[in-house]
């Protein structure tokens, strides 16, 4: 192995050992602790599946429903089946391809000390080597947010919601053990078709409800 590659490999080895000692608290129980879901779906509603409880064509006037809904954000809501996002469901992003998602270098990566002596030597890494190590760490630990359109069915309006999910097929930490998990979320207002049996018969109406969606992902311990 030529000297530059050997130097990079040595720094990565020492960095891995340091991170293991620093973040080992969550590591031993990685395979023993339950892993939470990275999605935030609507709580399953117990409803009669009969078509009599479905909205009729006269109940789907788009102008009236938009008036009831108020804020209609077409980036996340759609009445008709939309085209899928290019990165939807992609759980196998290449390490350095993650940089294409953009953004500033995280402060946690900038704060990593690469000047610690390696194996008793006094050599310090060059600025170029530091930058390469920072980029490698960023690409490896980066947790992009993937979007995909979800069809909620005819009893929700608009029935298509663009929901976020965290790519978690591989570990995002050095050493392995941490995965990408939801960090923040928000709520979209949509309408739900609700029918209630009254003495005078079936009473149905569109009612507003909050639909939770993930807005950011972060590399963190499981559990």
Swiss-Prot record:
It comes from the Eukaryota. Residues 1-26 form the signal peptide. Disulfide bonds join 143-180, 166-217, 172-219, 195-204. Keywords: Chondrogenesis, Developmental protein, Differentiation, Disulfide bond, Glycoprotein, Secreted, Signal. InterPro entries: Cystine-knot_cytokine (IPR029034), Noggin (IPR008717). One of its GO terms (biological process) is negative regulation of BMP signaling pathway. Glycans are attached at residue 61. GO terms for cellular component: extracellular space. It is found in: Secreted. The keyword Transmembrane does not apply. Belongs to the noggin family. Inhibitor of bone morphogenetic proteins (BMP) signaling. Homodimer. This is Noggin.
């Amino acid at each position: 192995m030529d000297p530059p590659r050997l130097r990079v490999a040595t720094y990565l080895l020492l960095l891995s050992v340091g991170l293991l000692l620093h973040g080992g608290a969550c590591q031993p129980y990685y395979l023993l602790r339950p892993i939470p879901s990275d999605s935030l779906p609507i709580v399953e509603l117990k409803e009669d599946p009969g078509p009599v409880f479905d909205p009729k064509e006269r109940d789907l006037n788009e102008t009236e429903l938009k008036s009831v809904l108020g804020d209609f954000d077409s980036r996340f809501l759609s009445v008709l089946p939309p085209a899928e996002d290019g990165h939807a469901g992609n759980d196998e992003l290449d390490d350095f391809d993650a940089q294409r998602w953009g953004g500033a270098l995280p402060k946690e990566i900038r704060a990593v000390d690469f000047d610690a002596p390696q194996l008793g030597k006094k050599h310090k890494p060059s600025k170029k080597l530091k930058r390469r190590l920072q980029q490698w760490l960023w690409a490896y630990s980066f947790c992009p947010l993937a979007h995909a359109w979800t069809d909620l069915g005819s009893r929700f309006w608009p029935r298509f919601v663009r929901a976020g999910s965290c790519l978690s097929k591989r570990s995002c930490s050095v050493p392995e053990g941490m995965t990408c998990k939801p960090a923040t979320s928000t709520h979209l207002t949509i309408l739900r078709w609700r029918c209630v049996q009254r003495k005078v018969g079936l009473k149905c109406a569109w009612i507003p409800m909050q639909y939770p969606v993930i807005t950011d992902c972060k590399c963190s311990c499981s559990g």
